[in-house]
Amino acid sequence: MDFFGVLTMLGGLALFLYGMETMGKGLEKLSGGRLERILEKLTSNPIKAVLLGAGVTAIIQSSSATTVMVVGFVNSGIMKLTQAVGIIMGANIGTTVTSWLLSLTGIESGNFFVQLLKPTSFSPVLALIGVCFIMFSKKEKKKDAGTIMIGFAILMTGMETMSGAVKPLANVPEFTGILTMFSNPVLGMIAGAVLTAIIQSSSASVGILQALCATGAVNFSTALPIIMGQNIGTCVTAMLSGIGASKNAKRAALVHLYFNIIGTVIFMIVFYTINAVVHFSFLDTAANAMGIAVIHSSFNIAATIMLLPFGSGLVKLACLTIPEEKKEAPAQNQEKDAFRLLDQRFLDTP
């Protein structure tokens, strides 16, 4: 890959990230704060919490944003730590929607109606409609809808640009050598975690992995541990939002971290133990965008089903990590309670 190829790839990545950010902000504005009110009224039913977490994240296209909202609610005292567990788990499931949307780019068929399902086919139309909404509509709701459409179109343009730019890498021995190295489960997990921590979005890092699949040099043996690491790396945003927050808010961020680490470790141990006995042949085949989406979704759903019954255990583990201190004087508590409901995390979402 020459200089201009690298430039094209970075430009595609910039468009991809900007499109995702634009679409997410448009969705948040269009919701008009209703998502927060729904989360506020959440019952203690863990299954409902998971469904709500998945639904909210699917709408705003960011598990990090959902988790940060939850940390804010716990910090303000609106939500109990035990209620936050289900939403955090559901957020991991909801974030997989993005990978499914991106996987539609790989549809191969000459059928006209099937081709219409490809985002690259309908995203230009959405962009045109979005521009018309923003330029000619006087209603804020329509302007927000236009922002969402344009954000999606930019996201898909960035995805296509990245995919086209990285295709020549399939013939570069150094690139294939690096990918072979990442087929080591530990190195692959570290790579996925670091990439996601840097860009602070598991959806974006999964999208980058899906774009790399266009080279044909990425096997599932390489993709799988990277996906596992991406689930750990996405916890960085919530951990950062917990800085300066209450102990319970920090615990909520830790619940997110522990849930992803424990789920990943258990999955990796079980999967590779079985693979040592009965080799999974699909690991040797070239990965594709659809397969990445399947693995991403399957892992997060399985981890939630497995660990949801142990939600209270995750809370206890977080409480052990950040134990309670001696009770403060009543006057100090009253002063803190007076300002507890004011939380900077809510000001980003109107």
Where are the regions that the model predicts?
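Hydrophobic core segments of alpha-helical transmembrane domains in multi-pass membrane transport
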Residues: 9-21, 53-57, 125-137, 150-162, ...
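Membrane-interfacial helix-loop connectors
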Residues: 69-91, 99-121, 159, 196-233, ...
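Hydrophobic alpha-helical transmembrane segments of multi-pass integral membrane proteins
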Residues: 42-69, 185-208
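Non-transmembrane accessory domains of multi-pass membrane transporters/channels
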Residues: 311-350
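Structural signal for the N-terminal portions of transmembrane helices
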Residues: 116-120, 149, 249-262, 281-313, ...
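Membrane-embedded alpha-helical segments of transport systems
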Residues: 59-66, 85-101, 119-126, 155, ...
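Interfacial loop-to-helix junctions that mark the boundaries of transmembrane helices
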Residues: 1-7, 109-121, 175-181, 221, ...
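Helix-loop-helix hairpins and the membrane-proximal interhelical loops
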Residues: 1-46, 145-194, 212-215
